[in-house]
């Protein structure tokens, strides 16, 4: 026995030599195993370092992506620019459109604003965005539900026009033969959107029936009428289920009366049989004129939407500094407005004109200036009229 290693006494010299070789080989293997362990340990350390580095890069990328989304929600153009510059988004219409279509963490109002811009890149992104929607075998209401949920329509007429034109082109491409032209699809789309508002807005008292909806859309199919069954299906779909319009944080009505365009005391001439002047606290904001009995009231006594209204100075023998809100080319219709009765009921206003008196000439001029800046023409009606006129002209040109 050597060094505590047992060795049988009856071994031949050859067997002893072989045993020595085995022992030496064993020692070499142990050294090799130790070396491999050390190399493996070094490799694992390197891998862990690489993983930590990759994790850090991923974390950094995610942070930059979140920052880019926030920038987009505040300023869409700058947000896209930030993402492109940081190589988080390719600067192609298709990739930008896919980013907006996925919409993760994006404000849908900001998406609508970006898609509505007139710059060359934005227009290309709009068409790429619309092409991501699959409208095949969907009726018009189903397609509009999908489209209008992917962003929030902006308020500017020209932006809405471009976006709805792109929608009409895509719908007709996916469903050839349903309409004779994209103009027909465009006009009917607006008619459906307005129907949704009329049927489901609690401030609209006069709810249109199927017959009126059908009559509204006569002659829009290149001068011909659309099948009544198609219109009935669209009408029933909207009546049974309104459009779901995206609502982003911070746009709720609790902020309506903060930072108004103008506010102050004015006299308003009543619309009843006995015309009396009543002092009211007026607030001008969001293209609406609200009036209250007291400045501390939380709910207005009346609301006058300024859509499609005009304003003019008038002389009144009873009160100085007067002006009127009126409907241009009015044919006996009442201004769309509502007021709260003493018993709490909300009823439609009873005014063909609203006559108002300011305390001074200067205040009258300021109110007129502010209201003129706020008065807006409803873009739906404006664009619808223009497109219907185009269909009518086209029909006349085709007649022998």
UniProtKB/Swiss-Prot annotation:
Q: Where in the cell is it found?
A: Cell membrane; Cytoplasm; Cell projection; Cell projection, Growth cone
Give the GO molecular function terms.
guanyl-nucleotide exchange factor activity; inositol 1,4,5 trisphosphate binding; lipid binding
| Covalent S-S links between cysteines | none
* Chain ranges passing through the membrane: none
Q: Share an example GO biological-process annotation for this protein.
A: regulation of ARF protein signal transduction
**Residue span(s) of domain SEC7:** 72-201
Gene3D superfamilies cross-referenced by the UniProt entry: 1.10.220.20, Arf Nucleotide-binding Site Opener,domain 2, Pleckstrin-homology domain (PH domain)/Phosphotyrosine-binding domain (PTB)
Q: How does the record classify its membrane topology?
A: Peripheral membrane protein
Tissue-wise expression: Widely expressed.
Q: How does it assemble?
A: Heteromer. Composed of TAMALIN, CYTH2 and at least one GRM1. Interacts with ARRB1. Interacts with ARL4D; the interaction is direct. Directly interacts with CCDC120 through the coiled coil domain; this interaction stabilizes CCDC120, possibly by preventing its ubiquitination, and is required for neurite growth in neuroblastoma cells. Interacts with ARF1. Interacts with FRMD4A. Interacts (via N-terminal domain) with INAVA (via N-terminal domain).
Protein name from the UniProt record = Cytohesin-2
* UniProt lineage: Eukaryota, Metazoa, Chordata, Craniata, Vertebrata
């Amino acid at each position: 026995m050597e060094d505590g290693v047992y060795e049988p006494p009856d071994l031949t010299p050859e067997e002893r030599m072989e045993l020595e070789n085995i022992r030496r080989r064993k020692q070499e293997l142990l050294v090799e195993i130790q070396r491999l362990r050390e190399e493996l340990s070094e490799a694992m350390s390197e891998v862990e370092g690489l993983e930590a580095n990759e994790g850090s890069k991923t974390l950094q990328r995610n942070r930059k992506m979140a920052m880019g989304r926030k920038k987009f929600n505040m300023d869409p153009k700058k947000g896209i620019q930030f993402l492109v510059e940081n190589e988080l988004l390719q600067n192609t219409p298709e990739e930008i459109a896919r980013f907006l279509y996925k919409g993760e963490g994006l404000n849908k109002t900001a998406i609508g604003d970006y898609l509505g811009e007139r710059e060359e890149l934005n227009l290309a992104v709009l068409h790429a965005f619309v092409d991501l929607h699959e409208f095949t075998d969907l009726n018009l209401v189903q397609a509009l539900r999908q489209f209008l949920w992917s962003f929030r329509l902006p308020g500017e007429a020209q932006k809405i026009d471009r976006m709805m034109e792109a929608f009409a082109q895509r719908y007709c491409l996916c469903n050839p033969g349903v309409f004779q032209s994209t103009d027909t699809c465009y006009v009917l789309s607006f008619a459906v959107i307005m129907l949704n508002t009329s049927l489901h807005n609690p401030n609209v008292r006069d709810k249109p029936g199927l017959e009126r909806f059908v009559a509204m859309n006569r002659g829009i199919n290149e001068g011909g009428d659309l099948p009544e069954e198609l219109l009935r299906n669209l009408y029933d779909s909207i009546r049974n289920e309104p459009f779901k319009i995206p609502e982003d944080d911070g746009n709720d009505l609790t902020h309506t009366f903060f930072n108004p365009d103008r506010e102050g005391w004015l006299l308003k001439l009543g619309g009843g049989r006995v015309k009396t002047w009543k002092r009211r606290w007026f607030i001008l904001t969001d293209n609406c004129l609200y009036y209250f009995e007291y400045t501390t009231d939380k709910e207005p006594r009346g609301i006058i939407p300024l859509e499609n209204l005009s304003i003019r100075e008038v002389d009144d023998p009873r009160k100085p500094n007067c002006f009127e809100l009126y409907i241009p080319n009015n044919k006996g219709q009442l201004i769309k407005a509502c007021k709260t009765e003493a018993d709490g009921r909300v009823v439609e206003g009873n005014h063909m004109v609203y006559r108002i008196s300011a305390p001074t000439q200067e205040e009258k001029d300021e109110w007129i200036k502010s209201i003129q800046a706020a008065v807006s023409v409803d873009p739906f009606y404006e664009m619808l009229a223009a497109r219907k006129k185009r269909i009518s002209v086209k029909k006349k040109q085709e007649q022998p």
